[in-house]
Regions:
Chain A
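ATPase nucleotide-binding modules
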Residues: 229-273, 277-293, 305-325
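Conserved ABC transporter NBD signature motif
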Residues: 61-69
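Helix-to-loop junction immediately C-terminal to a conserved catalytic motif
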Residues: 53
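Pre-Walker A (P-loop) beta-loop-beta motif of ABC nucleotide-binding domains
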Residues: 25-36
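The feature captures the beta-strand-to-loop junction immediately N-terminal to the Walker
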Residues: 38-40
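ABC ATPase nucleotide-binding domains
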Residues: 34, 75-232
């Protein structure tokens, strides 16, 4: 089911004194799509969301939702539901009154308000808590109520501003999955802002990676992971090894293998290849020129760190059962799987 | 029960009694004096009856109560939206507003009266020679106390997030303040209001030097001729103040309990509350 509308951010710029928080951001979101904006602190992702919500004003550029220009429309007239990073339930209202608040502002009668609020609470599984106050709920429950409250008004766009960052790891994963389930169920166009790459890759239809106010790459999670367009994306999304490589004829030679160089790589010469730990292979070899530095156990997987003959440290990710055979100091041969790699200039 | 806790309880009991006597004895003395018949001996309630039978005193009580009400209303109308606006839209102005609000504490009443004389010529020209025009100067006088009470209440809530949540749900600025902010700073508003009432009912210098007959001015005047009535009026004002504080404590008790529950719930660890958004 798709209830969503398209969203168009065009050439958005936002300047705070000497700081350029957004630098010509252009983003198109399809109806019903969930797009995650991912990036480090200060990259402009929250600024973009706040401008879309009407809580901040762009220095230049335009915001359009469903073909309607909303650039100068105030926040309370935009029909957008928002879940904030900080707990935002109104402390003086019960859960059900919180969820019904937006409907009250729209002049709905009490019966309709309560019925819709109960419907939303059922959607997020909190019907039993309808008469409690925010202070009586856990952090995860508060954010679920905030989600129900944002959806109760049947918003044209749902905005999620790092809604999970205040929660502990287990609740974060549960709520992340729940947000995706609910979003798919109601079909609302959604913009999700996060600095957690795992969160973004897990829930989004497309992920936009931002750096210094600019959109570096916007792509489906698998595409973004496999084919990063820029060194920043390669580095920010997933762990990366930087391994010396030689590029010629679209092929990169590294770790004794020749693999395709991804678009965006240097055209020829020496550079650094961005290699994912899962693409690195380690083989026990008494005559190997590399040696195991350390083994990090991470549950089902382990990371084996090796030092190459030239001193470069490379991390390989493998099943813990496979990593058991390695101990620090063991001589090994390090290789790379024949997937594409991005090769950047050695100074980059 | 060990000796330490018994000793602690004893000490607490002794302190309770000592402080109780310290505060209650003057009140008892006032009550005793105000019910004495100084001419014939024995007891009389004439001084208390004078509070409503003496026309000048009765008028002064009404004027003082009206001044208290008008001062509280005007103070809240000016201060609450201003403080909310400063916190949300102009945090750079917070220091200036705080300085201006606290300034009256540092200026003697006599200086205020002299300074306001010219201003009050205009006030009298437009509004007449009513004692109720003291409302304006009283609003200035209560600013330091009201500011502190409201500032504490506003600091206790995440004003930015709550108001942005309300606006994103369709509330305009007035609805945001009336339906979301005010209910969550209610205890601060009550504190500011009650402290302001206490200040207004206790103010003498400005009213006296400005020539207006407020309750305190009347108490001093009556005290020159009729001691018991003057003391009865003073005691009534004191008891009224105590009752106000008691009501304040009762009204905010429930909210303090809620606050205690709030404190037990883990707060966001990485909440963005201010500064340039990411």
């Amino acid at each position: 089911m798709t209830n969503g509308v398209s969203v168009e951010l065009t050439d958005l710029t936002r300047v705070y004194g000497p700081v350029k928080a957004l630098d010509g951001l252009t983003l198109h979101i399809e109806p019903g799509e969930l797009v995650a904006l991912l990036g480090p602190s200060g990259c402009g992702k929250t600024t973009a969301l706040r401008i879309l919500a009407g809580l901040d004003e762009a220095t230049s550029g335009s915001v359009s939702v469903g073909g309607q220009d909303l650039t100068k429309v105030p926040a309370n007239k935009r029909d957008m539901g928002m879940v904030f990073q900080a707990y935002s339930l109104f402390p003086h209202l019960t859960v059900v009154d919180n969820v019904a608040f937006g409907l009250k502002m729209r002049g709905k009668d009490k019966g309709d308000r309560l019925s819709r609020a109960d419907e939303m609470l059922e959607l997020v599984g909190l019907t039993a808590h309808r008469n409690k106050y925010a202070s009586e709920l856990s952090g995860g429950q508060q954010q679920r109520v905030a989600l129900a409250r944002a959806l109760a008004i049947q918003p044209r766009v749902l905005l999620l501003d790092e809604p999970l960052s205040a929660l502990d790891a287990k609740v974060r994963v549960q709520l992340r999955d729940e947000i995706r389930r609910v979003q798919l169920e109601v079909g609302t166009t959604t913009l999700f802002v996060t600095h957690d790459q795992e969160e973004a890759l897990a829930v989004a239809d497309r992920v936009g990676v931002m750096s210094q106010g600019k959109l570096e790459q916007l792509a489906a999670p698998a595409e973004l992971y496999a084919n990063p367009a820029t060194p920043f994306v390669a580095e920010f999304v997933g762990l990366n090894n930087k391994v010396p490589a030689e590029v010629s004829g679209g092929q990169a030679k590294l770790l004794g293998s020749s693999v395709p160089a991804l678009p965006g790589s240097i055209s020829s010469g020496a550079g650094l290849a961005m290699v994912r730990p899962e693409s690195v292979t380690v083989t026990a070899d008494p005559s190997g020129t590399a040696s195991v530095t350390s083994v990090a156990f991470l549950g089902p997987i382990s990371r084996v760190f090796c030092t190459l003959a030239d001193g470069t440290v490379v991390g390989a990710q493998m099943a813990s059962s496979a990593a058991r055979v390695f101990s620090p100091g063991d001589p090994v041969t390090v290789g790379v799987e024949p997937t594409g790699v991005l090769v950047v200039e050695a100074g980059g | 029960m060990n000796r330490t806790s018994l000793g602690g309880k004893l000490l607490r009991g002794v302190l309770w009694v000592a402080f109780g006597l310290f505060f209650l004895f003057p009140l008892y003395a006032m009550a005793d004096f105000s019910t004495r018949n100084l001419l014939k001996g024995g007891r009389t309630l004439q001084a208390w009856k004078n509070l409503v039978q003496d026309d000048a005193l009765y008028q002064a009580i009404v004027i003082s109560l009206l001044l208290a009400v008008f001062t509280v209303v005007l103070m809240l109308v000016i201060l609450v939206p201003t403080m909310i606006w400063v916190r949300l839209r102009a945090p750079w102005a917070k220091g200036v507003i705080e300085f201006l609000c606290l300034l009256p504490l540092t200026i003697p009443a006599l200086v205020i009266v002299v300074g306001l004389r010219n201003v009050y010529l205009w006030v009298a020209y437009f509004l007449g020679e009513s004692a109720l025009t003291l409302t304006f100067v009283y609003v200035v006088l209560v600013l330091p106390f009201a500011y502190r009470a409201l500032d504490g209440a506003l600091s206790a809530i995440d004003l930015k997030t709550l108001s942005e949540a309300a606006r994103s749900l369709g509330a305009g600025w007035f609805a945001t303040i009336a339906r979301v902010v005010v209910p969550n700073i209610w205890s601060g508003i009550l504190s500011a209001a009650f402290i302001s009432i206490a200040v207004v009912l206790g103010e003498y210098t400005i009213a006296s030097l400005s020539g207006f007959q407020t309750l305190q001015v009347q108490i001093v005047l009556i005290g020159k001729a009729d001691g018991p009535t003057s003391v009865a009026a003073s005691l009534a004002v004191l008891v009224f103040g105590f009752v106000l504080l008691l009501v304040l404590a009762l009204l905010t008790r429930g909210r303090r309990r809620t606050g205690a529950i709030d404190a037990a719930v883990p707060a966001p660890t990485t909440a963005t509350q201010s500064g340039v958004p990411t």
